[in-house]
Amino acid sequence: RSSDLFEYLVERMSWLLGEHAVDYVKWDMNRELVQPGHKGKAAADAQTRQFYRLLDVLGERFPHIEFESCSSGGGRIDYEVLTRCHRFWASDNNDALERNTIQRGMSYFFPPEVMGAHIGHHKCHATFRQHSIQFRGLTALFGHMGLELDPLTVDAQEREGYRHYAALHKRWREVIHHGTQWRVDMPDTTTLAQGIVSEDKTQGLFLVSQLAMPDYTLMMPLRMPGLDASALYRITLLDHPNIQITGEGGHTMRKLPSWMEAPQTVSGEW
């Protein structure tokens, strides 16, 4: 019976969380909804409501534990479960290249502070691509940042990268989690740009991602929305992946925009 199953799950989960030093639970479910109905009834709907009920019981018993909900197998990110969990895991595909578009799509519906965005291993388990720690760290910066790997298996340079980007995230976390998020439309479809501006509009953090070979020889102008039109802003490059530029064996298409080569003072007028 469903009531017996529910009580069994409550008992087992309570033992697990009560007898062990658990601070965080990722509630994962990697399967498709192949049988949403059963015997003429909305089984998936009933199961979801019981899942909410189970989280209610566990949340009351263990208020110190953070729950992270899963998105896989049918897109189970929803606003109702957000009243019971602290964040969502956007995708098991943790490839930083793929994550740029995944996280962009999620940003239309949910704010950065509830989006699990983790630095993964340099060789992604899902795509087998390999990315620098800079690219992975900056991709994970604009969310609920974490690490999705075993730090004991990597070299000192990787570990230093983890420390650097964790510190950078903590430095900007107040803005990232409480500012106003902006998605910037770029003329070149191979470029993604986004930013978050503080509530008082005194500072902002923007990320520009070049995801493929550009359609244009030189980068198009970058416009930063959401700023105070009457103010002047100092544009400073905080961090970037290693880039081979013109003069070091590069090509004209690798020429960096002026704001990457030196700080700029610009108007906040859109």
Stretch-by-stretch model annotation:
Residues 1-7, 11, 18, 48-49, ...:
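Glycan-recognition surfaces
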Residues 8-40:
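Active-site groove signature of glycoside hydrolases
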Residues 25-30, 68-72, 209:
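Generic beta-strand/beta-sheet core signal
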Residues 28, 67, 140, 206, ...:
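Conserved, mostly hydrophobic/aromatic
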Residues 31-36, 74-79, 123-127, 148-150, ...:
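Flexible loop/turn segments at secondary-structure boundaries
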Residues 131-185:
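Catalytic cores of secreted or luminal carbohydrate-active enzymes
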Residues 186-229:
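Carbohydrate-binding surface patches
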Residues 212-270:
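C-terminal beta-sandwich/jelly-roll accessory domains of carbohydrate-active enzymes
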